[in-house]
Amino acid sequence: MSHVDDGFRSLTLKRFPQTDDVNPLLAWEAADEYLLQQLDETEIRGPVLILNDTFGALSCALAEHSPYSIGDSYLSELGTRENLRHNGIAESSVTFLDSTADYPQAPGVVLIKVPKTLALLEQQLRALRKVVTAQTRIIAGAKARDIHTSTLELFEKVLGPTTTTLAWKKARLINCTFSHPQLADAPQTLSWKLEDTGWTIHNHANVFSRTGLDIGARFFMQHLPENLDGEIVDLGCGNGVIGLSLLAKNPQANVVFVDESPMAVDSSRLNVETNLPEAFERCEFMINNALSGVEPFRFNAVFCNPPFHQKHALTDNIAWEMFHHARRCLKINGELYIVANRHLDYFHKLKKIFGNCATIATNNKFVILKAVKQGHRR
């Protein structure tokens, strides 16, 4: 369990999913404390917008102001809701919005946890540009090492004059004043042609490897099985290229695209609509924490390129959760296929969970593994 004391209240916070006790990761960071310190003497007038509040430290601390929590992570929303409940704060105190939603007009305060990707930051700053005023207090925070010249230039370009604070506990803040600088329009998605197909892949701002096909997915696509039927899953679908390939290779199968990022799920939907419209009726699109709440014994196969980081933190907790959810939701003799970096040693992890694991293909960087749900394992 992680604790944070600040000028607003004392909170008990935990990550979501929880990390193990051997290598615990905190549910808050110095940048959260630093941001809250800046508001100690501030009279807040107008809506409070909080962007990219990973586990709800800011939302819980500012709950009395009925903030809007804006981001592109269903896991973050679940974590924030859990921490609100755990601290005896009504979940209704916080309004949750996707990054692509319309933001409330004329906010009094905007707090931004600087995201990992500049593309997401730019999308969010452009959305803020439509609603903030010169009187809106705009403060962003991150580890000092994660604030670069390009970060500051982006604030200047989209919103206006920008300054930084001194570092405190290895965190730094960005202060910005809206001045309505001239700014050219930008497309909502980035698109590129997928090699060896006639497909155009559309990517929202927060989609993994949005500028081109990542090498792990390329390797995975070379070894996807054919002649599958029933329901199969692209788990952690991103822009949906794996699911698209499965749709094309398996005309008797229905594909469920699942991701915790609303932008990823929307990108997958858009890519099916524009590239395989005739297959759209064979698709389901789901924003979810892996396969939480999905009935057991439903799927014939699950395909997964699991992440090994959550925001800036390295962790295999999400991958572990995906593997356990896959086993629960697979039919007997159903198969889980994954692609992963070789150094992660998922072979032994899958063998521990499923009781078996086979190597389908390998190269100098990646490995494709298959585990089968056996009848005697519940």
Swiss-Prot record:
The keyword Transferase applies. Coiled coil: none annotated. Its EC number is 2.1.1.174. Its main location: cytoplasm. Keywords: Cytoplasm, Methyltransferase, rRNA processing, S-adenosyl-L-methionine, Transferase. It is an enzyme of class 2 (transferase). It is found in: Cytoplasm. InterPro entries: DNA_methylase_N6_adenine_CS, rRNA_m2G-MeTrfase_RlmG, RsmC/RlmG, SAM-dependent_MTases_sf, Small_mtfrase_dom. It comes from the Bacteria. GO terms for molecular function: 23S rRNA (guanine(1835)-N(2))-methyltransferase activity; nucleic acid binding. It catalyses: guanosine(1835) in 23S rRNA + S-adenosyl-L-methionine = N(2)-methylguanosine(1835) in 23S rRNA + S-adenosyl-L-homocysteine + H(+). The keyword Amino-acid biosynthesis does not apply. One of its GO terms (cellular component) is cytoplasm. PANTHER family: RIBOSOMAL RNA LARGE SUBUNIT METHYLTRANSFERASE G, RIBOSOMAL RNA SMALL SUBUNIT METHYLTRANSFERASE C. NCBIfam families: PRK15001.1 (NF011577). Specifically methylates the guanine in position 1835 (m2G1835) of 23S rRNA. Belongs to the methyltransferase superfamily. RlmG family. This is Ribosomal RNA large subunit methyltransferase G. It comes from Salmonella dublin (strain CT_02021853). The lineage of its organism: Bacteria, Pseudomonadati, Pseudomonadota, Gammaproteobacteria, Enterobacterales.
